[in-house]
């Protein structure tokens, strides 16, 4: 049987009342990977059966989750880039998000900070420049961590709305500092998101910010 005929046959069985049959159909569809999603979306749009639509939605979600899980594993086994990891978290909530938009927005912020920077600034002055651009010019706000406010944990929504929580604003702050070569690091304190400016001598922090 050709691939297109098999897919059509599988789609015809999506509304099968036998759960065992549907499970086998579902697993076979998932084996096709992400490229089958547009076909599933087209099927959803042209299906009047609500139960079948729910099954299609679940299959699409499982396909996206499977791909995202693989991306997280690759991220963990690679260089574990902070921004890329944050974007993967966003992708769980917004599977169709375009990461390039977030990269472009961060680059705009970085350039605005960079224009105000020079090699003669003290560590405190560097921090003040970053915070002035981030919090005064861009009006970024990081509030209290509220776990049912899911969007506030996603870096893409922070960049779009300029509203997040201590975690997402802290991640954005760290990413900007890394891009600008400013030695700001996260400090491991339980239930807190604290950042510190570390001198080249390493352990002594000359400035910290809770970013709340």
Show the residue positions of the predicted features.
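A structural boundary/capping signal
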Residues: 1-212
């Amino acid at each position: 049987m050709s691939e297109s005929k098999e897919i059509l046959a599988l789609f015809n069985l999506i509304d099968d009342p036998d759960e065992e049959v549907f499970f086998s159909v579902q697993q076979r569809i998932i084996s096709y990977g992400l490229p089958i999603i547009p076909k599933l979306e087209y099927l959803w749009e042209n299906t009047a059966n609500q139960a079948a639509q729910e099954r299609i939605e679940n299959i699409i979600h499982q396909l996206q989750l499977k791909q995202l899980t693989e991306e997280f594993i690759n991220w963990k086994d690679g260089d574990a880039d902070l921004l890329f990891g944050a974007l993967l978290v966003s992708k769980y909530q917004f599977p169709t998000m375009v990461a390039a938009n977030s990269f472009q927005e961060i680059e705009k912020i970085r350039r605005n900070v960079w224009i105000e920077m020079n090699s003669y600034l003290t560590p405190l002055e560097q921090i003040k420049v970053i915070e002035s651009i981030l919090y005064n010019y861009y009006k970024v706000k990081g509030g209290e961590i509220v776990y049912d406010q899911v969007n506030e944990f996603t870096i893409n929504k922070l960049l779009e709305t300029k509203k997040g929580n201590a975690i997402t604003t802290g991640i954005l702050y760290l990413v900007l500092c890394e891009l600008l070569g400013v030695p700001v690091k996260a400090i491991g304190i339980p239930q807190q998101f604290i950042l510190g400016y570390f001198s080249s001598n390493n352990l002594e922090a000359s400035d910290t910010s809770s970013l709340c």
